[in-house]
Every structure is written in structure tokens, then in C-alpha cells.
Amino acid sequence: VSNGEEVFLGMNRLRLVFAVLAAVVVSCNPADDEAPSVFSLSFDFSQVDNGWTGDFADYPQGDSVTYELVFRHDTLPPNLNSNGTLKALMLSGNNMSDDLFMFVKKKITGLKPNTVYNILFNIRLVSNAPTGAIGIGGAPGESVILKAGVILSEPVKILDGDLYYRMNVDKGNQLAEGEDMMNLGHIGVAPNTTQYTAVFRNNNSGSPFRFTSGNTGEAWVIVGTDSGFEGRTTLYYTKIDILFNEVGPI
């Protein structure tokens, strides 16, 4: 099975899981007493940013211009946007340290307090990174790892003692997963391509992300890329779907 077929089959399987689990949802407010054990959140960025914000970490203080760091709700590339009206969350950076983290985040509410959830992510993004290519520090596709997580506190960058911006969450490092974020694959599209192409990445029901809510039922979603490729990476997030499957109280 080719990589493209694996992505297609994986997306079909995840869509089936989302459809079956969503069928049991009987309330739109997961915090109600009659709340369902399964619910999903869906964010489409084709017209609005839906309150998501972006930032960067793992770079030296004062080097945001040198690293060409840009986040904005921007128009999709022309080959995927024939009428010129479709937008996405765009992140771009020139990784000069062999370790640049680019991320988007959003606060969510309405979770059941002190409850364990199994979470599935379905991330749709646009990338022009080829697979099988050689780059400085790592490959432009396979060495840029997509990660996602749900955490209690707002994910922010902080300045460490070496005057580098680091994350206040455990995201792991490049291929290594962290306590707060799991790997969803790389951003590579296909061999020898430089054309922006839609990419779908997800985890499945066999490897959910485990999260325990706090007293308030509030949390933060974070999605980002951990790069070992020393060069420019530009990505467009078009849609983020998150499914929460309640396991039970702690």
C-alpha cells in the first residue's frame, strides 16, 4: 500500500469512527447532567480563525525577524483556491537552529470536571514539503513532525536561562513525543513535489490521547510542528476536528 493510499484509508477509517461515535451525541453541551459520553469539536478556517492564535518556540531571543516567523489567517495558495476566497491558519518560519516549533492553540470549555477522556485528532493542513528529499539537519518532509495535545494550562513560550524561547509544556523533541503532545506523523506530501497539497493526519481509536480535565472543565488545545529541518517551512491549517470520548471520573 502506498503512502497516499495509507492516508486515504486512514482518513476513511477515522471518518467512520467519528460518524459512529457522533451518532450517540444527544446534547450540544457536554457539561450538562444529561451530557453524552462522546462529543466532537470542529473548527473550519476557510473564512474565520475561530479564535485560534499562533506562536513559535525553540529559537533565540531577538531572532524572530532572522527566523522569518509569520502567523496569520491567510489566503490559501492559488492551486487550492480557484476563487481566491478560501483562507487557513498560516504558519511560516525559517528554522536556523535545527529545532523550531510552530503552533496554534485555542481555549475550550464545557468539559466534565475531573473526568478522563480519550481524544482523537483529525488535522487537515496544506504542505509543499516533498518526501524522500535531503535537507540540512533533516528532511523537509519527514523531519518536520506534526503534534497535538490537550492540556490544562495555556501553552506559551517562556525565555530560559540560555535566552531561548521554550514551551511551558512537555511536547517532546522532534520525533520524541512528550507528556502533553502526541505525534500525528510528518508533513511530507509526495516525492519530488513542490506544489502545495492537502495533507490529512490523525491518530486512531487504538492510540487515543489521554487527558484528565480539571475542576473548571476548561482546557487548551495545541497543534504544532516540531522541526529538525534547517530551512523554511510554510503550512496552512484548514480544519481541525477533535473527538472526546469520556472514559469516566477520576
Each predicted region: which residue ranges?
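Bacterial Sec-dependent N-terminal signal peptides
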Residues: 24-42
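Extended, low-complexity, turn-rich repeat/linker tracts enriched in Gly/Pro/Ser/Thr and Asp/Glu
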Residues: 125-142, 229-232
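Extracellular glycan-recognition surfaces and repeat-rich motifs
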Residues: 53-84
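A short beta-strand element within beta-rich, extracytoplasmic domains
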Residues: 116-132, 223-225
